[in-house]
A protein has these predicted regions:
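Secondary-structure boundary/capping motif
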Residues: 1, 13, 25, 30, ...
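Short beta-strand-turn/beta-hairpin segments enriched in glycine/proline and small hydrophobics
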Residues: 1-10, 27-43
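Short histidine-centered loop motifs in beta-beta connectors
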Residues: 7, 12-21, 50-53
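Short hydrophobic beta/alpha edge segments that flank linear recognition/processing sites
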Residues: 23-39, 60-69
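A cross-kingdom feature marking charged/low-complexity
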Residues: 55-57
């Protein structure tokens, strides 16, 4: 399951790492936009298999940030 950015912003912090167990609703990435920090949560429970962003990276709304299987 793809975890996508719900806003355009900058990756402020990565909360989970490849191989970590992730629960539904767990914050995987924190985005910063207009000086506000917004968590991007996993919609499913599983294991983080891919991380497609890095801290400080600018991302567009809809960009795939991570993958949980």
């Amino acid at each position: 399951m793809d975890i996508k950015a719900h806003i355009t912003g900058t990756v402020w912090k990565i909360e989970k790492h490849i191989g970590d167990a992730v629960g539904s609703g767990d914050a995987v990435v924190i985005l910063e936009s207009m000086k506000m920090e917004m968590p991007v949560e996993s919609p499913v429970t599983g294991k983080l298999t891919e991380l497609r962003c890095s801290e400080g990276q600018a991302v567009e709304e809809g960009a795939v940030l991570a993958v949980v299987e």
